[in-house]
Amino acid sequence: MAKRGGLCVRIITELASAGELGALMQIENACFPPTERCTPAMMKARLQQFPEWCLTARRGGSIVGFIHGMSIGQPAVQDAFYYIPALHRPGAPWQCVLGLAVAPAFRGKGAAHSLMKAYAAKARKARKQGIVLACRAEKQAFYEHMGFVCAGISQSRYGGGVWLDMVQRF
């Protein structure tokens, strides 16, 4: 449970149901610019390909945030990971975050940190070497606060522009 400002957010580490795709997409659309958004079809494909890696934060039964991603072979993000869910390799040593999103009304209340903490605990339990993600420079400090280290400019150009690869080794 994350609690700040009188708000409790409970982390659910269960698969989001197909009926919750609309709620996930509503948050996705509120959090990312059009060039960086996951499409409904792609979100559905990700949920089908790696449901065990889609964690949700809920309040009163409603989804207020989520984190999802795939298992990969190296600590670097590639554009293909965003487009081809079949690249997920369950036994691979690294866990990649493809999306971390919290509804605007619930930001600053600990939901993102709780989601990442739960995701990391799950990755450790799965004996991963660590977590990797790509972020914009303005989010670097946010992820460093969660224990990530900048590994340099990412080879990913997803949605245009420059990304940084952030790595958290276990």
State where each predicted segment sits.
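Conserved GNAT acetyl-CoA-binding A-motif
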Residues: 95, 116, 121-136
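Short, Lys/Arg-enriched N-terminal segments with co-localized hydrophobic residues
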Residues: 1-8
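A short beta-loop-alpha structural element at the N-terminal edge
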Residues: 9-24
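Short acidic/polar active-site loop segments enriched in Thr and Asp
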Residues: 53, 129, 149
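Active-site rim helix/loop that mediates acceptor-substrate recognition in acyltransferases
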Residues: 33-60, 66-87
